[in-house]
């Protein structure tokens, strides 16, 4: 009798393993399909959008000089070194130029790629966290078709790269903290390192602030202890430090003054556009950024308020923590709170 029972258990276990493998295969196939569709959605017609002045043209010219000069470490424009942003945006554009030539399409392809990759990652993470494929796919569809995400997935700026790496930074950190999963914490730190190579210290500072606030609200000391694994900290420095160390070794104080000083500290403490320096700036901008899903966003916030799950609280801190962080900054840009947009489609 026990032998028959053991056989049934082994058979059931084999079926479960087979189903698990098939689910992973199907999920991989689905994610590849989502990425391909999203890439076509964002890249379609990009060749009809000429590079605009002055912001897009500066990025495009810097990437072009990177290809022509062969210097892929020190960004330069008009023959002079330029420390406006880290190298990630120029690397991606330079790869695109090397493959497709110096065209408008090649200039915008990295943004389309990052937008598609962000959608794909979002779907995977939501499926992983909620165990609901329908919710995950709809989250991706809503984000892809929201106004600001669509625009920035066509724009030649660094925000699409920052979004791509901030999503896994925060969502892997959430999984790692809730499940005590060291692997996901390492992924979070690795992604944060890539975010710092995309737009500077904000790739670490903002996610770090969000996670610390959320851990505090959860009132769980174990979460704080899990937040700083030495493996994650090590992989962060291995990822982000080499380029910064190289730039300082080659360019010295001018790099520190212009990149960390002018383009980070000065913008945070002194407004470049005083006319936009209003405390309500981003709170007015957010509803327009979410179109056509604005109404659904506010409905879901109200609907889920009663339950207040750990994930819901995490998303609330993500959104409003981002808005508050940039509201306190002196310089305000339309795209600064872009990473808050991804939160709104997770609710």
Task: Pin down the residues of each PLM region.
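Terminal, Lys/Arg-rich, intrinsically disordered segments and adjacent short helical elements
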Residues: 1-23
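Membrane-integral, polyisoprenol-dependent glycosyltransferases
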Residues: 29-346
